[in-house]
Structures are given as C-alpha cells and as structure tokens.
C-alpha cells in the first residue's frame, strides 16, 4: 500500500487560536493511523531564517513570513512571487513523496498549495475554520452592517467580493467546513457545488477528564477566548451591569488574549463589576477553571465550531451561548445550553438580545 502524505499548510503568529488547537488534535490523532504520514509547512511571522526538521517519517518546514509587508498583504502578484520562493525551498524535501495531500488551514495559503501541486502533484484539501466576511465586524463595522443587511435578504454582492475566497474555492479539490452555516455560505455566495464540500465538526479526545462538584456559593461566570467585541464580551458586560443593578452579583473571569486598550476600557467602564482578567493560561489551568466555575458563557457575535464550547461541554459546565452559526448547530436550547438570540439594527449593528 502506498502511503499518503498529508502536508499541513499553516501560519504561525504566536497567538492561540482554534486553528492551532485543530492542528494539535489532528497531528495527535494521525499518529495512530497506519499508512498516513503528516508533515507541516509553517509560515512563521517570528522567524528570520528558514528552519527544517527532516526525519524518515516527518518533515517540518518553518519559513519566515513577513506578514506586515504591504506588498504581500495587498497585492496577489507579490504574494505569488513569495510563494514561488517558498515552493523552491520546500520542493526538494517532498520530490520523492507520493500521494500528497496539501491540507490548507488558511485561505491565503491555497495559492501556495496550488504552486506546490503543479510542481509535485497531489490534491488540495482546504479547511475552512471561519466565515470570512464576518471578520469585517472587527476591522470595518460599517462594511459589516451592509454585508449583514444583505445577508439577511439572501443577497451576496458585497459578501462575495473576497478575493482570497474567489481564488481558493475553485483551486481546491475538496473543502472541509466545520459547520453547515459555513457550507451554506460557500454555496450561496460563491456557487460552489455541494458535492465538493464536506462538513466535519471539530472534536477532542476526552481521555482523563474528571467531572467535579461545583461548590462556589457566589456564581462564577467563565469566558474563554479572545477578549474582544466580536466575541461578545461587551454584550456580556452590559448584561452583567443590568443584573447588578437589580441586586444580583456574580464574579466574571475573562481568559484569553486581551489588548491593553480593551483591558483598560473594561476596568474603567465596568469597575462596579467583579472581574478578573486572567490573560492567556495553560490548558492545565483551563481544566481547573472549567471544573470550578459555575457557568460557561460563549456570547460570540459570530462563531464556528468552537473548541472552547467543546471543552466546556466535556467538563460538564452549564452553558449560555449565542444563537449563531455553529453554536446553533452544537447546542439545543434548554437541553444542553441556553441559547441567546441576536438582534440586528442597521444603525446600531449586531447585538445579543
């Protein structure tokens, strides 16, 4: 039997993310699969020189990636030039490998996968971890409001202007989505045939997880994720303000990456609330938080198949989640979570109800 060689293409920025978690789960799981070898091509934003680790079973290539370079960020021509250089560096290590599967974790890298495919053969498998147009909520809210308004009316002339998506989906031999909402996006906005798409939810190994009794008298609410508006943190804080004004008090723990500006804003604007901003913590510390806090909250304004949601569920946390995207698929209201609807106004934007 000819061995398959799965080559994961990813970008490393040093920040924790669902993509990083997925790759950890995938590589660990693949160790137990016969006939499959897993390799990694990583474009690393912190490197100056390329670094290769080569064994008989595995190739790990770390390539410098100047992500802040304006030509690479703004022009497909220069990005393609860069990818050609990366291909020239990498190709000698894979020239004798057969049954290559270029497993792309970022839409940006599909063009690199296509260059490698033309040189070395194989197939391109694109893994869609996000719905790209919804990211505009974070960097261009005015655009997001227009896109969301059109999406509600099943029109896509603003949504389908994403150049990366226009390039990536036709070049992909197969596309994996982590939710049916993402699959619907690809079909509706870009006309990709459903037969080309598979939906595979994220998953985790639950070995070694022990459920514990929660003993805290004061309700302790746990949020895990990037501490930002799009993750619903401001909506959560506003809701807790209303609860406090009615004489009910709880403690909120915010775990995850947080900018200095956001941290300062939270401490000033919500100083009447009991809030601990813990920053990024290890998974062992997360386990402790999952088992000792009263309620897990995922108030995201958009969300795919969240590993935090999976982890909280595995540890038996009572949960409140926003009724959006993959969270709507993962949780049944008043069965395994309380689902909070979203409301949209063209002037005020998207909020939790």
Label each PLM-derived region with a short phrase.
Residues 301:
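Aromatic "clamp/platform" in nucleotide-sugar-dependent glycosyltransferases that forms part
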Residues 104-109, 128:
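Short His-centered aromatic/hydrophobic patch
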Residues 132, 148-175:
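Membrane-proximal helix-turn-helix segments that form the acceptor-binding/catalytic region
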Residues 21-28, 219, 223-242:
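A conserved mid-protein helix/loop that constitutes part of the nucleotide-sugar donor-binding site
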Residues 181, 203:
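Carbohydrate-associated surface elements
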């Amino acid at each position: 039997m000819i061995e398959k060689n799965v080559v994961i293409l990813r970008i490393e920025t040093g920040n924790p993310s669902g993509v990083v978690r997925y790759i950890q789960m995938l590589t660990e799981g693949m160790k137990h699969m016969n006939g499959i070898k897993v390799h990694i091509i990583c474009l690393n934003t912190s490197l100056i020189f390329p670094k290769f680790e080569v064994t008989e079973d595995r190739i790990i290539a770390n390539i410098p990636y100047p992500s802040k370079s304006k030509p690479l960020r703004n022009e497909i021509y220069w990005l393609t030039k860069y990818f050609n250089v990366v291909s020239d560096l990498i190709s000698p290590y894979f020239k004798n490998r057969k049954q290559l599967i270029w497993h792309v974790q970022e839409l940006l890298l599909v063009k690199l996968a296509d260059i490698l495919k033309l040189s070395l053969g194989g197939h391109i498998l694109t893994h869609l971890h996000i719905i790209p147009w919804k990211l505009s909520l974070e960097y261009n809210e005015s655009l997001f409001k227009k896109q969301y308004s059109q999406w509600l009316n099943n029109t896509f002339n603003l949504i389908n202007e994403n150049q990366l998506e226009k390039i990536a989906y036709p070049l992909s031999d197969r596309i994996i989505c982590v939710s049916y909402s993402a699959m619907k996006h690809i079909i509706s906005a870009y006309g990709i045939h459903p037969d080309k798409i598979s939906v595979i939810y994220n998953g985790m190994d639950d070995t070694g997880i022990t459920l514990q009794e929660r003993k805290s008298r004061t309700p302790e609410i746990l949020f895990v994720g990037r501490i930002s508006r799009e993750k619903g943190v401001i909506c959560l804080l506003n809701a807790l303000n209303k609860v406090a004004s009615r004489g009910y008090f709880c403690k909120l723990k915010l775990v995850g990456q947080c900018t200095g500006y956001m941290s300062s804003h939270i401490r000033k604007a919500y100083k009447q609330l009991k809030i601990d901003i813990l920053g990024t913590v290890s998974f062992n510390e997360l386990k402790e938080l999952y088992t000792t806090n009263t309620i897990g909250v995922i108030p995201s304004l958009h969300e795919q198949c969240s590993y935090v949601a999976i982890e909280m569920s595995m540890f038996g946390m009572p949960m409140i989640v926003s009724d959006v995207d993959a969270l709507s698929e993962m949780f049944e209201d008043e069965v395994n979570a309380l689902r909070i609807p979203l409301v949209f106004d063209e002037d005020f934007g998207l909020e939790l109800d």
